[in-house]
Structures are given as C-alpha cells and as structure tokens.
Amino acid sequence: MRHLRFLPQEIISSETGIEILEFVVNTLMGDDPEPPVQPFDPPTLHDLYDLEVDGPEDPNEGAVNGFFTDSMLLAADEGLDINPPPETLVTPGVVVESGRGGKKLPDLGAAEMDLRCYEEGFPPSDDEDGETEQSIHTAVNEGVKAASDVFKLDCPELPGHGCKSCEFHRNNTGMKELLCSLCYMRMHCHFIYSPVSDDESPSPDSTTSPPEIQAPAPANVCKPIPVKPKPGKRPAVDKLEDLLEGGDGPLDLSTRKLPRQ
C-alpha cells in the first residue's frame, strides 16, 4: 500500500477506501480505467498553421515594422548577432544586444551577383592546339563531302574496280574490300545462277514422253540378257562382268561362304 503513504494523517472514509481499493485492483489486474471522454479534440499543428486570426488594426504597426528591419527579426529568431544600422541608434535607450555572441549575420540587402567565372586554365600548347584544329577541320570537311556526295549506281567493266558506288560505301564504312550490290552480284553470279547444262532451251523433241531414240546403239556394247528367275541360289561370281554374260540359272549376288570347321 505505497499509495497510502502520501495520504494525510487523517481518518479515511469508507467511500475513499473503496475507491483506493478499486484503483489498486484495476492496476494490478491490468484493467486500467478508460480515459474520460473529452468534449472536443485539441487542435493539431496543421490546424494552428492555417489558423487566421482577425484582430483589430494597430495604428503603430507600420512604425514598428519600419523600426525593426527584416534582418534584425531574422537575427532574433536565429540567435545571431547583427550590427544595427545607423538609423536605429538615433532613438535613445534602444540597444541591440545578443547574449549568445560569436555569430554575425551578413547584410541581407539587395545586391547584384556576378556569377561569371573569370579564371583561366592552363593554355594549350602549340602542338596540341594545331593538332586539334587540324582534326576538327578534317572531320568537318569529310562530313560536308559525305553530305554533298550523292550515291550513284555505277557499272564498271571490272566489278569492284573503278566503281563509284563501291568507293562511296568504302569511304562511309572504312572497309576497303567492300563491294556494292551490283558488283557483288556480277562477281559471284556464277555461284548462284550457274546453268545446269550447256543448253537449257526447250525443244519439241525433248518435251515428248517417252523420248524417241534416234541414233542406233554401238555394236560392241555389252547388254544384259534378261533371265527368268528360277528357284534356288545363284552361283557366286568374281566380277561384275560375269553377271552380264547370262546363264541358265538366275544371278547369285551373295558372297561366298567359308566352310565350317
């Protein structure tokens, strides 16, 4: 009962004791009493920030604002020390002091600021300056020349040599072995458009089906003799010509079998 230590040395009434016991029990059991309901919510900082106060006009407001400049008001808010302007020292008894000291606020009057940089770096050497200007002139000339040149398709006698279109592509890409499309096709046409035979012109004789045999076959050509197949195995042969000589039995193209041991 540490709460009773702060009570005066008087007799406690029954009602006060009951209230104290209920408070102790609720505190120990974790059942805190609900906070009292407030009739209205207190204003927040956002409400106070946008709050507009309409008060009576002060006839001395203009004189006070003219006496204390903006720099002095800012110095008072920031706790800085500022030298008062000469006109504020005319009134006796007014002294602008700062108990914090050590800091001074710069003059907040209007001033023109020059943001131009007047510093100069190291001057370039004569060699570097000349090389840079020369490279710039060369690049400009090449760009003007490339823009002024118009692409023209050329067909020289030898593909890839003396061709204006090939030179145009070589200058733009930097590849000396580049060819234009026409020179490439003329140079490699035999790989793509090579004829199948010497004469591909259609003739009325070649279109007939089946074709007619005009020239007789030579007499010394060995022709195979058709043989009716018979049952049984054909004898093995040593060479292909033996098959063309014919025979009583059918041809045997099987290999010879070795006798079993």
UniProtKB/Swiss-Prot annotation:
Residues 43-51 are annotated as: Interaction with RB1 in competition with E2F1. It is found in: Host nucleus. One of its GO terms (cellular component) is host cell nucleus. A motif (PXDLS motif, CTBP-binding) lies at residues 250-254. GO terms for molecular function: zinc ion binding. A motif (Nuclear localization signal) lies at residues 256-261. GO terms for biological process: regulation of DNA-templated transcription; symbiont-mediated perturbation of host cell cycle G1/S transition checkpoint; symbiont-mediated perturbation of host ubiquitin-like protein modification; symbiont-mediated suppression of host innate immune response; symbiont-mediated suppression of host JAK-STAT cascade via inhibition of STAT1 activity; symbiont-mediated suppression of host type I interferon-mediated signaling pathway. It comes from the Viruses. A motif (LXCXE motif, interaction with host RB1 and TMEM173/STING) lies at residues 115-119. Changing G62E: In strain: Grider. A zinc finger (unnamed) spans 163-183. The keyword Aminoacyl-tRNA synthetase does not apply. Residues 78-149 are annotated as: Interaction with UBE2I. Pfam families: Adeno_E1A. Residues 203-212 have a biased composition (Low complexity). Keywords: Activator, Early protein, G1/S host cell cycle checkpoint dysregulation by virus, Host nucleus, Host-virus interaction, Inhibition of host innate immune response by virus, Inhibition of host interferon signaling pathway by virus, Inhibition of host STAT1 by virus, Interferon antiviral system evasion, Metal-binding, Modulation of host cell cycle by virus, Modulation of host E3 ubiquitin ligases by virus, Modulation of host ubiquitin pathway by virus, Oncogene, Transcription, Transcription regulation, Viral immunoevasion, Zinc, Zinc-finger. A motif (PXLXP motif, interaction with host ZMYND11) lies at residues 106-110. Residues 197-261 are annotated as: Disordered. Interacts with host UBE2I; this interaction interferes with polySUMOylation. Interacts with host RB1; this interaction induces the aberrant dissociation of RB1-E2F1 complex thereby disrupting the activity of RB1 and activating E2F1-regulated genes. Interacts with host ATF7; the interaction enhances ATF7-mediated viral transactivation activity which requires the zinc binding domains of both proteins. Plays a role in viral genome replication by driving entry of quiescent cells into the cell cycle. Stimulation of progression from G1 to S phase allows the virus to efficiently use the cellular DNA replicating machinery to achieve viral genome replication. E1A protein has both transforming and trans-activating activities. Induces the disassembly of the E2F1 transcription factor from RB1 by direct competition for the same binding site on RB1, with subsequent transcriptional activation of E2F1-regulated S-phase genes and of the E2 region of the adenoviral genome. Belongs to the adenoviridae E1A protein family. This is Early E1A protein. It comes from Human adenovirus B serotype 7.
